[in-house]
Amino acid sequence: MIVVKRGKEPNSLLQFRKKNPDADYEDMPSSVRADVREQMWNEQKHLCAYCMRRIDNPSDVRIEHCRPRHPKDEVVHDKKATLDFKWMLGVCYGNSLVKGVKPEDMTCDAHRRNKELAINPFDEVSVRKIKYKADGSIYSEDAEINKDVTDTLNLNCPALSLPQTRKKVLLQAQKRIVQKCEGKSQGAYIHELERTYKS
């Protein structure tokens, strides 16, 4: 999972909210959605906020709401909050477009549905509680966050080879670091590890 840093909302979304103060997400025009997708795609460096898979085009971005649009308690549901850009995430389709896909083979918001999340993708402290194993699987020692990544979002889904893909990326990064730091001090090696971790 990546830490999402939201910039200023697209102007088209701001104007839509101003002109339509009682609107919610369902009322958003397709042109505004396209602007939202494109901005999130760029801000997230073309990665799904949850599984970190590459998203090839802005049109392939699914607009996810970190806070569910239809929570169980509709009484306290604030429909205007569904247009709040700071709570929107760009995610992949989580294998949901595959015909006949089983629910256990879906990931990200396709698997999440309307469940609340303990993890906050906008909070670095929260995201840093996710740990990576050598086999590419992820977990957290925080029980609620662990439930989010392993069950609610299904981020260790074997159907999409998510752990194997992470392992491959990890091995590539390790190889690059070793090559870059060959013959250098331990401090240089640690510095490169930190730089890679933060990127």
Predicted features by range, described:
Residues A49-R53, E74-K79, R113-P121, V125-S126:
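Intrinsically disordered, low-complexity boundary segments flanking structured domains
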Residues V101-L160:
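Long, low-complexity, intrinsically disordered segments enriched in glycines and aromatic residues
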Residues E144-S199:
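C-terminal, charged low-complexity interaction regions
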